[in-house]
Curated annotation (Swiss-Prot):
NCBIfam families: PRK10922.1, UbiD family decarboxylase. Homohexamer. This is 3-octaprenyl-4-hydroxybenzoate carboxy-lyase. The lineage of its organism: Bacteria, Pseudomonadati, Pseudomonadota, Gammaproteobacteria, Pasteurellales. Its EC number is 4.1.1.98. It comes from Actinobacillus pleuropneumoniae serotype 3 (strain JL03). GO terms for cellular component: cytosol; plasma membrane. It is a peripheral membrane protein. The gene is ubiD.
Length: 487
């Protein structure tokens, strides 16, 4: 499935009953977030608020509020198909030369998809049908949502921030929340390890007194949006991966005020710069953890131009205690991670990030155990192999007879196969999410690995218990007579 832009995707969703238009007047202050939250928790549709109170621009929420819609946005029918995308990413992350002609032929579909990677630059784009500059720039005219009563100000949530470091040809797309503090001012909250922050850091070192160019696209096509949240290799651009998802080159255009490329079909684009010497106190905001975060200083994004499509749609979301939209995205993208991990660690059978673990703070891994100490090797691998898991606090490793996605199974394995002293690994002074106030120091905390596997010789001196298994012949017999038993 290919979607030229966000509007084509919305048409498809509406045709499948996956989008509802709200014609009543709804306030972006708290009301939209409350409606979106209730809808998401019952697995409901995407919502287009056609009459935001005090604004003329409609607001789109809950777009990726179910795993099915995430899969549809990636051009797939269901989340199971996302594993194929993971296999492609694993191939692109560490491509190996084919061992023979037969293997070369087998790799042709993957290399064919690679042809869609280069972007197509347009001279004229829909995202620039309306251009505002100078005094015309007024962010207060956008229906930016205020999601929680304790939030300090409205918050831009689904902006795709485009940046480029001074030494890189590749441009980075990242999603960072942005606090509204003035008609042309936003606070750019990006963590130090994220692509945009790394580009900015390099820029400050190379050009300490020059403004850092930034463009932010709101309401891009679904493939481009989802490419920005997918664990792609560092050498691959988000635009290139969006082309792979779409099966068609990503159309971009040059920003009006800088050289950054923006999605040509985006609904709204904010252009401007960050002064390396200007920061502001950000927050507090209710976050995906279910708590309000601490205040901290971050760079200020000054908006010099706003461009948009005619009759533009403002795309937004809210975050809060799981489940929320980031948790749903994490649940769906979980399928993408598995083949990437399996390429490096073939012994991994399944990998699961429970949504209630705030998308990434706890991981359950099942393996085909092969030797003593194997579980600890896998723990270390999860923490170090992909940057996405550097903030994962807890890794639980189980045998392949345990269902990683069934808490009853996992808890049974922990309570019967784990000794608290022998089978827990604690590591101090590791990178931790700044939003994790449970850590003793902001950005620095500990990790715990739990080995809930059966123990091998060398790991225990005791005779190990044998799991009870049912006789398959008896199970089959009872299955055949079950309906006759009246039970």
């Amino acid at each position: 499935m290919k979607y030229k832009d966000l509007r084509e995707f919305l048409t498809l969703l509406e045709g499948q009953g996956e989008l509802v238009r709200i014609k009543q007047e709804i306030d972006p202050y708290l009301e939209m977030a409350e409606i979106s939250d209730r809808t998401l928790r019952k697995g409901g549709p995407a919502i287009l608020f056609e009459k935001p109170k005090g604004y003329r621009m409609p607001v789109l929420c809950n777009l990726f509020g179910t795993p099915k819609r995430v899969a549809l946005g990636m051009g797939q029918e269901d989340t199971h198909a996302l594993r194929e995308l993971g296999k492609l990413l694993a191939f692109l992350k560490e491509p190996e030369p084919p061992k023979g002609f037969k293997e070369l032929i087998g790799q042709l579909p993957q290399w064919k998809q690679v042809l869609n990677m280069p972007s197509k630059v347009l001279g004229k784009a829909d995202c620039q049908q309306v251009v505002l500059s100078g005094d015309e720039v007024d962010l207060y005219k956008l229906p930016i949502m205020h999601c929680h009563e304790g939030d300090v100000a409205p918050l831009v949530t689904w902006g795709l921030t485009v940046t480029q470091g001074p030494y890189k040809k590749r441009q980075n797309l990242g999603i960072y929340r942005q606090q509204l503090i003035g008609k042309n001012k936003l606070i750019m909250r990006w963590l130090s390890h994220r692509g945009g922050a790394l580009d900015f850091h390099e820029w400050k070192e190379a050009n300490p007194d020059k403004p850092f160019p930034v463009s932010v696209a709101i309401g891009a096509d679904p493939a481009t949006i989802l490419a920005a949240v997918t664990p792609i290799p560092d050498t691959l651009s988000e635009y290139a991966f969006a082309g792979l998802l779409r099966g068609q080159k990503t159309e971009v255009t040059k920003s009006i005020s800088n050289d950054l490329e923006i999605p040509a079909s985006a609904e709204i684009v904010l252009e401007g710069y960050i002064d390396p010497n200007e920061t502001a106190l950000e927050g507090p905001y209710g976050d995906h953890t279910g708590y309000y975060n601490e205040q901290e200083y971050f760079p200020v994004f000054t908006v010099t131009h706003i461009t948009m499509r005619r009759d533009a749609i403002y795309h937004s979301t809210y975050t809060g205690r799981p489940p929320d939209e980031p948790a749903v995205l994490g649940e769906a993208l979980n399928e993408v991670f598995i083949p990437i991990l399996q390429k490096q660690f073939p012994e991994i059978v399944d990998f699961y990030l429970p949504p209630e673990g705030c998308s990434y703070r706890l991981a359950v891994v099942t393996i085909k155990k092969q030797y003593a100490g194997h579980a600890k090797r896998v723990m270390m691998g999860v923490w170090s192999f992909l940057r996405q898991f550097m903030y994962t606090k807890f890794v639980i490793v189980c045998d392949d007879d345990v269902n990683a996605r069934d808490w009853k199974d996992v808890i049974w394995a922990i309570t019967t196969r784990c000794d608290p002293i022998r089978d827990t690994t604690l590591i101090d002074h590791t990178p931790i999410d700044y939003l994790d106030f449970a850590s003793p120091i902001a950005g620095l905390g500990s990790k715990m690995g739990i080995d809930a596997t059966n123990k091998w010789p060398g790991e225990t001196s005791r005779e190990w218990g044998t799991p009870i298994k049912k006789d398959p012949n008896v199970v089959k017999l009872v299955d055949e007579i079950w309906d006759q038993l009246g039970l």
